[in-house]
Swiss-Prot record:
Family: Belongs to the triosephosphate isomerase family.
Protein name (Swiss-Prot/TrEMBL): Triosephosphate isomerase
Catalytic activity: D-glyceraldehyde 3-phosphate = dihydroxyacetone phosphate
Superkingdom of this protein's organism: Bacteria
A GO cellular component annotation in the UniProt record: cytosol
Main location: cytoplasm
Gene behind this protein: tpiA
Role of this protein: Involved in the gluconeogenesis. Catalyzes stereospecifically the conversion of dihydroxyacetone phosphate (DHAP) to D-glyceraldehyde-3-phosphate (G3P).
Keyword Cytoplasm: yes
Keywords: Cytoplasm, Gluconeogenesis, Glycolysis, Isomerase
Keyword Coiled coil in record: no
Pathway per the UniProt entry: Carbohydrate biosynthesis; gluconeogenesis; Carbohydrate degradation; glycolysis; D-glyceraldehyde 3-phosphate from glycerone phosphate: step 1/1
Species assigned in the record: Baumannia cicadellinicola subsp. Homalodisca coagulata
Positions of the catalytic residues: 96 (electrophile), 168 (proton acceptor)
EC class name: isomerase
Amino acid sequence: MRHPLVIGNWKLNGSKHMVSNFIISLRNQLSNMINCCNVAIAPPMIYLDRAKSYLTGSHIALGAQNVDLHVSGAFTGEISAKMLKDIGAKYIIIGHIERRLYHKESNEDIANKFACLKNEGLIPVLCIGETKEENEKDQTKAICVRQLDYILNIVGTQAFKNAVIAYEPIWAIATGKSANPLQIQKIHKFIRSYLFNHDQAIAEQVIIQYGGSVNASNAAELFNQPDVDGALVGGASLKADIFATIIKAAARAKKN
């Protein structure tokens, strides 16, 4: 049985004050939810150490929003997988459209980042998804396959053991417009079926999250879909009470 996973991607938001207040509040609101749902937050890199200190003793994990391809060296401004492991991060987001678009990261770059994370025993959270134009041309499945194939060809099927896939239709990210839950289920089922053709056991255990304007109002309906194993939450993860509501919705849906 797959355990639901909800991750908060803070993107370029936060402060020392926010980190401490947010985590204290979230811990209080989730105090009776031990082992009901896996939870992580991914603040900006500069706040990882502070977040880790406030997360200590809780079941909330630390995530990060990016990783570099290199272990060490003259790469100004970058963070390696080894460093993320050293600071206590567990879930590392890669392939997000904002990285693909603004930093020109290719599918090959993302596959190599995936490999770096696996080599350090960290859990990649691989973001895949299509643009509005690709969706309108009914190319969603083909785009998802292309993005998955880079991982399968470079790293191999076994790399998806203890990994996470986040289906994030690009047209739904930070727009307030979430995809229809039945459409989401259809794509999640397709992704799982595609992996099933490579390895049945891995397909059945891999966590497939949804990302794209997830909020307190639509979370319950999303999580009621059998192949939606959680969410990668953006803006709604910046307020502890809203994020807690989403987490509780995941726990309730997957408990039934």
